[in-house]
Swiss-Prot record:
Function: Part of the twin-arginine translocation (Tat) system that transports large folded proteins containing a characteristic twin-arginine motif in their signal peptide across membranes. TatA could form the protein-conducting channel of the Tat system.
TM annotation in the entry: 1-21
Gene3D superfamilies on file: 1.20.5.3310
Full protein name: Sec-independent protein translocase protein TatA
UniProt keyword annotation of Magnesium present: no
Single GO molecular function: protein transmembrane transporter activity
Gene this protein is translated from: tatA
GO biological process per UniProt: protein transport by the Tat complex
Organism: Campylobacter curvus (strain 525.92)
Quaternary structure and partners: The Tat system comprises two distinct complexes: a TatABC complex, containing multiple copies of TatA, TatB and TatC subunits, and a separate TatA complex, containing only TatA subunits. Substrates initially bind to the TatABC complex, which probably triggers association of the separate TatA complex to form the active translocon.
Amino acid sequence: MAIGVNQLLIILVIIVLLFGAKKIPELAKGLGKGIKSFKAEMEDDKPIEKVEKKGDDVVDAKVEETTKNA
């Protein structure tokens, strides 16, 4: 069951009646920005390479505690 040209025209007329001809470009622009933002966020979710920790890079440090008597 495919959507034909007649059904698409009816849907378009209903959208124009609901939102008005002036509002449709604004809605399309907002939808486009949302899709672009979604795609950008999906690209950011690529797996991050794990960093291997080696014992050779560990630095030993000694912490000295100083106290002042008031």
